[in-house]
UniProtKB/Swiss-Prot annotation:
Keywords: Ribonucleoprotein, Ribosomal protein, RNA-binding, rRNA-binding, tRNA-binding. GO terms for molecular function: rRNA binding; structural constituent of ribosome; tRNA binding. Part of the 30S ribosomal subunit. Contacts proteins S9 and S11. Belongs to the universal ribosomal protein uS7 family. This is Small ribosomal subunit protein uS7. SUPFAM superfamilies: Ribosomal protein S7. It comes from Rhodococcus jostii (strain RHA1). Pfam families: Ribosomal_S7. It comes from the Bacteria. One of the primary rRNA binding proteins, it binds directly to 16S rRNA where it nucleates assembly of the head domain of the 30S subunit. Is located at the subunit interface close to the decoding center, probably blocks exit of the E-site tRNA. The keyword tRNA-binding applies.
């Protein structure tokens, strides 16, 4: 294991079209096989579709979707005397954003629409309205934490 501690966080460059670091993070989550220009095209077209359907700024829609998907609690496995407990812990802000983006992209890929642009746009719109699979994942995560509240004293 390295002894110098964790690598320093690299600053996120604001995205050139919307000037938002969240859009940059979304592009990086969509990215497959190093094809960044393809990922950017998918994200920008999806945000444009979201703008056409809602008539509002797509970055606002993205932020609203993220706020509806970000988990406040999650469970972590903790081994105590031969038994493994699911211990509920609070999620740090950076991790909650990362999880929300990951869930949005994962569930966009599982949707049935024809193109990835449509899938991502519709998942974003659903999430911003409090619907969709990504929001359900957040609710399930919170339910797990609530169900295991008895083990909260094992937090570290």
């Amino acid at each position: 294991m390295p002894r110098k501690g964790p690598a320093p966080k690299r600053p996120l460059i604001n995205d050139p079209v919307y000037g938002s670091p969240l859009v940059t993070q979304l592009v990086n989550k969509i990215l497959l096989d190093g094809k960044k220009s393809t990922a950017e095209r998918i994200v920008y077209e999806a945000l444009e579709q979201a703008r056409e359907k809602t008539g509002t700024d797509p970055v606002v829609t993205l932020k609203r979707a993220l706020d509806n998907v970000k988990p406040a609690l999650e469970v972590r496995s903790r081994r105590v005397g031969g038994a493994t407990y699911q211990v509920p812990v609070e999620v740090r802000p950076g991790r909650s954003t990362t999880l929300a983006l990951r869930w949005l992209v994962t569930f966009s890929r599982q949707r049935r629409e024809k193109t990835m642009v449509e899938r991502l746009a519709n998942e974003l719109l659903d999430a911003s309205n409090g619907l969709g699979a990504a929001v359900k994942r957040r609710e399930d995560t919170h339910k797990m934490a609530e169900a295991n509240k008895a083990f909260a004293h094992y937090r570290w």
